[in-house]
Every structure is written in structure tokens, then in C-alpha cells.
Amino acid sequence: MANTKKTTLDITGMTCAACSNRIEKKLNKLDDVNAQVNLTTEKATVEYNPDQHDVQEFINTIQHLGYGVAVETVELDITGMTCAACSSRIEKVLNKMDGVQNATVNLTTEQAKVDYYPEETDADKLVTRIQKLGYDASIKDNNKDQTSRKAEALQHKLIKLIISAVLSLPLLMLMFVHLFNMHIPALFTNPWFQFILATPVQFIIGWQFYVGAYKNLRNGGANMDVLVAVGTSAAYFYSIYEMVRWLNGSTTQPHLYFETSAVLITLILFGKYLEARAKSQTTNALGELLSLQAKEARILKDGNEVMIPLNEVHVGDTLIVKPGEKIPVDGKIIKGMTAIDESMLTGESIPVEKNVDDTVIGSTMNKNGTITMTATKVGGDTALANIIKVVEEAQSSKAPIQRLADIISGYFVPIVVGIALLTFIVWITLVTPGTFEPALVASISVLVIACPCALGLATPTSIMVGTGRAAENGILFKGGEFVERTHQIDTIVLDKTGTITNGRPVVTDYHGDNQTLQLLATAEKDSEHPLAEAIVNYAKEKQLTLTETTTFKAVPGHGIEATIDHHHILVGNRKLMADNDISLPKHISDDLTYYERDGKTAMLIAVNYSLTGIIAVADTVKDHAKDAIKQLHDMGIEVAMLTGDNKNTAQAIAKQVGIDTVIADILPEEKAAQIAKLQQQGKKVAMVGDGVNDAPALVKADIGIAIGTGTEVAIEAADITILGGDLMLIPKAIYASKATIRNIRQNLFWAFGYNIAGIPIAALGLLAPWVAGAAMALSSVSVVTNALRLKKMRLEPRRKDA
């Protein structure tokens, strides 16, 4: 190969030499490619002809074989974007770079998230490429206070606006002269006076528009800056032309438009200031989450208590937390007992009792006891840090509904410039032949009324506010895509254990005396069965003292047999009693049947071969489960239960909570197949689960919803995480999705409708340029303001027929 290039790719998923050989063989089948795959280093070195192949082709080949190529993710702060055309252009350029897998740019947050292959490119190259487009970019510093930076930028915008307004106000009075025949001092109509006021507004205050326009045009793009610069420059320089004619004596009554250019810039700055202020409110939810973190921790060093900054705490450090203080990091109690307010995580206001060996979560509040704890997770690994990360990613992500706006934004400015030019030609040749001023005014109005900003802000602002509001209620969407997909759900499948039920068996019914219960609990205390644990806990709640067993024997499939203090104990089913010639009275037999039909595990107790009691144990239904399912039904959503339990138990639980469809006796590996069956019927399915065995079904479903009290595997596989275990958050999540998508549609309707209606009206000469400019400035503000309504969203689902 004469013209060759070499690249190295990090490969994931290889387990043996067969894997590396397979990848190497497949790559070498490509023309003019020489590939070597090393299993030990997990790298593929590929020499190729760049005229025939690119790196993405090799990546696709590897992924098609079922392996992965390692990617890194970087978040970038970008300043200088003024409208959707800017963010769309940056995104398009980044996605065309070698080594970039995917890039998204968010106009609202002024950030980019880029997934890239580290062997092909790096973060510095990404920053440099953005800077070449004329924008400032830097790698996001998570330790930097973003709030103060944005506050400073907002203050700078306000100062520029005030200066511009002070200079433009006298010029604005000239407009009232034309509109209302007002009398004003002659000074205000003096061309020199107008020139002196308008020039600093045009070239000092408005210099940012020229810089932005130049950088965009130099790189083959066009944005809002181009429209503003061209429109205001046309008015300003035509006024200069008229002023020169006046100085030469060619005219005694110059037609000046200094007020148009200056007032336009002021109005646009006013709109941008309002927009920035409104956008800063969209991130309030994230700020509130960050404010939950403790600032310091009390560490135990050499027997002394020392206060240190939170970022200096390491895994394994011994910390002391006193009443009224926040738990600094995630950890485990090694001394003391207390009650902890975990409402920030679970929404449950009642404090949770904590003892030695119990886990505690950072940023929760220690209520009434001093505890000593060991730090197990710190920094970015804590529960709160992971919640913040999910919210950040959701707020910076894109929903598919935004694609149309992104496509249009890329062509918007050139089309508007073309329409403005056509407007000028039509006016000067057909409407007012040979008359320059009306043609100029109409074309300027077209330029300044067009607003690509509203298009770019319509979706991301709603996503930011909607996901933030959901997070405040304990609902974590992992991205805008999932917000959009959730509103289409018409079927919800709930796992039973740990989702509908608490996942912890408890004693629901007991008939017998305390001595029988004491002997029963003593017999069961050495058993590892979860039902035994429930019985022991029940006895402890009754403050009964447990003794020791003399003998203990499990009777497989039937129960247990034990000897305690010369008492012979039998605990089990009918068969165990029959085998030991113990008869059942009819009322006991009826009770046993009743409990079993109700989905409970019922056990008979015999002491010294005489029946002395009956006890029933069951996994109880969660509080509000019935209410949550009723709300889902009211929303027109079908609810089904999926479980590995037998049909009788499953139907008993389903009857309690109001579920009609029960899919029982399902093996864990069959859950995903059951979801697929529902999807084949044309249903949009959400799966709700909490266990490791739910993960495949969560992935298979259109939307996977993990209960936050569940396993990390389930949470990782899900698209939405419900903090705590409250099922009422499921209908709230669906309503939040519907409300957010409805808000996005309102924004897009306004953004498209405004431009579709506004541009023709301006072209017909029905709007003065300053009115058009005011409309443009306020259009994006209206979109952001509408999105901010979601902050007050009450997550109360509506009936489908409401």
C-alpha cells in the first residue's frame, strides 16, 4: 500500500483467542487492510488506504461481530452561541470529525457532550475545532461554580443593555414623532445628534453581532448575528448616505434611520437578557440538588475529631456525625444508633431507624443520635452524585422531536436573507418602483423579525425544566429520548416481588398463645428461610424471649421438627401433621384454605403432638400500590403483573391492587420474551422492576422503569429510575412526560408559527423595523417563559376522558 495510514482501536468484549482471531480475520478481508488484534492488550492495530476506508468502517465491522470499541466522553462549555444555527453548525462539524462517535450541542445549557474514540482524537482537538468556528470552548470543570459564572455573564448583559437603552431612548422619541405627531426639541432631529448617539450603539454595543457574523460567514455558516448585522447596518449606512447628502446640500430634509438601527440593537439585547435570565431558572432543580451536599465532614484522626472539606474524605475514613448534621458521604454505621431523614432520596418524611452495620446515604439528615461511620463511597460515586449526573445528562440530551427544528435551523438564515433580498427587489421594481426607502424598510423588517433562536430553544428548555421538575419529585429520566418515548406508553408491566410488594415477608395472621409463638420463633431462629426471619421478627415485636433448640431437623417440602426444653415442636403443612397423626379441626382447616387462597403461606404448629396454633406469612403489598394502579387505569393505561410465583398467589396480590392481567409461573429468563409478546400486539410497553432478573425485560421494553430501592443492575438497565419505592411516582412519571411533550409542541408551534406568519407580514411592509425587532426579541423569551411553566407543574395525572 503506497498511501497508508495506521490507527489503533481499543476493543471490548473479547474473552479468548477465538474472539481476537475472528476480528482480525474479518478486518483483513477488507481491501488494502492489514490488521493485527492483540487479545492481551485488547487493541486492534489497522493499516489501511485512507482513499478506500475510514476508521468508522472498522468500528462498524467490529461492532457487527458483537464486540465494542471503547469510547470516552467529554463535556465542553461553549460560549458565543446566539441561536439554533450556531448549535446546529457546531454539532454538525463535530460529528464529521474523525474519531467522533456522537456529539450533541445544547443551546440552552451552552454545552456539548461528545463521545469519541481516544485513539483517533482527543478533547483538545475538539476544543480547537470549535474555536476555529469562532466560538470559545473549554473542557467542563465540575469543580467550578457554574452558577456564579452565569450570574457574571448575566450582569454583563444587563450593563450593556442599560448603556444601549440610555443612548437609544432619545432616538426612540423620534419614532413617536412619526407615529403621534409629537413636538420634541429640535436637537433630537439634528443629524449630528442622532449620529453621535447611534454610532456607539452600532459599533461598540453591537460589535458582538459583527464579530459573530464575521466568524460564521468565514466558516461558511450563517446565524442570527448575520441577520442583525445586515439589518442594522443597512439602516445605519443608509442614514450615513442621507447625512452626507445633507452636508453636501443635496437635501434639506434627510431621511435618517439611525433610530431604527440603535433601537433594534437595544431591543435584541433586551430580549437576549430576558432569555438568559429565564434560561438560568431552568437549571434551578440541579442547583437545589447540589445544595443538598454537605460542605464538610468530621473525621476521626488519632482519636481527635477534625473538620475537613468534603472533597478530602476518602473511602475507609472514619467519620462522626452528630444530631442535626448531614451525612457527608455514603457509608456504614460502625457505632451508635439514630434516625435518619431520607426524604431527599425517597420522598418519605418519616425518619428511618439506623443501627450498627446499616448503610447511610450522603446528604441525608441525621436526626437524633451521634453515630460513627465508615466512608464507603465518596465524591462522584455517592448516591447523590449519581442522581445529579443522571439529571445533568437528561437536561443536556436531545429528544427526537427536536430533529426537525435542527434541520430547519441549519438552512434558516440563508433562506431569510434570500427572502429579504427578494422583498427588496419586489418593492423597488413593482410595489414602489424606483423608491428606495420603502424597499429598504421592508427588507430590514424581514431580516430582523426572523428568529432562529425560538426554534433552537423550543425543545431543550422544556426538557431541562421538565426533567428537573421530575427529579424534584424523585423521578429520574436518563435522557430527552425517554421523556418523549414515555408519553406514548399504553401498557405497564409490573414485577411483583419488591415492586408491587415490599419484598419482605411479614406475619399477617396468627392464632395461638404466646408460649406457642415463643417455641415457634425459637425453632425458626436458626433457619435461613425468609419466612423464618419474619416469624422471629414478629416474636421480637411481641417482646418474647427466645431460648435454644435441643434438636432441629428440616423436613423437605413439609416443614421443620425441633425439640426445645423437652417440648416437641412441629411446624409445617397438612402433610406434616398427617404424617404425625395430628388431626385438624374443621375451622383450622377452613382457615388454612382461606389463607392459601389469599396468596399467603400458612403453617400449622403442633406442640407435643397437639395442634396449638396457625400462622400465616406473606409479602405485603406496598402502601399506595392500589391507588397508583387506579391512577394508571384512569389514564387509560393497561396494567399487567409479571411474576415467577404460582397463579394463586399472583392472582391474590393482583386482586388486592386491582390488576386484571396476571402473567404467572414465569422463569426469570422468560420475562423479556413476555414483554416482546405484548410489543408484537402493537402495544407500547413499560416494564417496572427492581431485581437483577428484571434487567433483560427492562432493556427489552419500550421504557424500563427501575425502583430505586432495587439492585444496581436493574437501575443501570432502566431508562427511568424511581427513587425510593413509591409506586405513585409511576403515573407521575408518565404525566410529567406527557406535560413536557405537550409543552414542547406548544413551543414548536409558536416558533414555527411566528416565523411563518411574521416573515410574510414584514415583507408586505406592514411592520416597522423596530416593531419587527421587538417581536423577534420577545419570541424566544416567550418560548423560554412557556417552558418555565413546567416548574409549577403539579404531577397529578389526568383521567383519559378528562
Curated annotation (Swiss-Prot):
GO terms for cellular component: plasma membrane. Residues 5-70, 72-138 form the HMA domain. One of its GO terms (biological process) is copper ion homeostasis. The keyword Ion transport applies. It is a multi-pass membrane protein. Keywords: ATP-binding, Cell membrane, Copper, Copper transport, Ion transport, Magnesium, Membrane, Metal-binding, Nucleotide-binding, Phosphoprotein, Repeat, Translocase, Transmembrane, Transmembrane helix, Transport. The keyword Kinase does not apply. Cu(+) 1 binds at C16, C19. The active site is at D495 (4-aspartylphosphate intermediate). It catalyses: Cu(+)(in) + ATP + H2O = Cu(+)(out) + ADP + phosphate + H(+). InterPro entries: ATPase_P-typ_cyto_dom_N, ATPase_P-typ_P_site, ATPase_P-typ_TM_dom_sf, ATPase_P-typ_transduc_dom_A_sf, HAD-like_sf, HAD_sf, Heavy-metal-associated_CS, HMA_Cu_ion-bd. PANTHER family: ATP7, ISOFORM B (PTHR43520), P-TYPE CU(+) TRANSPORTER (PTHR43520:SF8). This is Copper-exporting P-type ATPase. It comes from Staphylococcus aureus (strain MSSA476). The lineage of its organism: Bacteria, Bacillati, Bacillota, Bacilli, Bacillales.
